[in-house]
């Protein structure tokens, strides 16, 4: 675990491998929540006691939440700085990655966007909602609390509760559009941007569909990216998609983990693998020197 890495680094006779993973966790904004028996949206109205089902369809709300996430503090306090803070789902290590702008932590900008949201009704009426994370995941729990506390600090009429849900139930509920914000990760099935950008952005993607996010231009680009074999054309496509991730304020990519492996310095032959860090520990390929 990251808190113990400095202690391990101080030990003599060890070789450490820091391996950024081809995986990313994000907080997704659902733009059409299922209201049936749903406590996560309160009254289901913008009346101070809930949020409407399409609360996050207003880009001003999404931008407000993005500006309320303190990436630098999160990186230091949760990961001891040993993490990659991604700017889009096309994380470092994947082809055609580029750093796109992020919504830096700025509570004034967050408040300004909240004042614009829903023609000023969000700021005047206030709202109440619940953010959930899966039980036992401290990294996602910390992200949920950071969003909740910073948004609530903007206006006493903003009320957000954080709850944990068992993993098996979490999966069922986010797939039934029960969460206005759901926090979940994705690991590479194969090391290509399509596996991430389609998953996160396409209206039929594994996560895109459960955000109820639909953008014909995004769908077209996602489909063109996998259908094309020309590297230059693919680069252009995926650069556009990464730009759209920012301008559309689709969701909040929170972290790309770095796994640390420690071996005695006389152990040789370990080759880090960004997809299969643990499974790649092939004993037949490791030797003592």
Please give the residue ranges for each predicted region.
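Long beta-strand-rich cores associated with HINT superfamily self-processing modules
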Residues: 261-289
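Extracytoplasmic/periplasmic ligand-capture domains
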Residues: 1-78, 84, 94-250, 286-289
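Glycine-rich and polybasic anion-binding loops at the starts of cofactor/ligand-binding domains
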Residues: 254
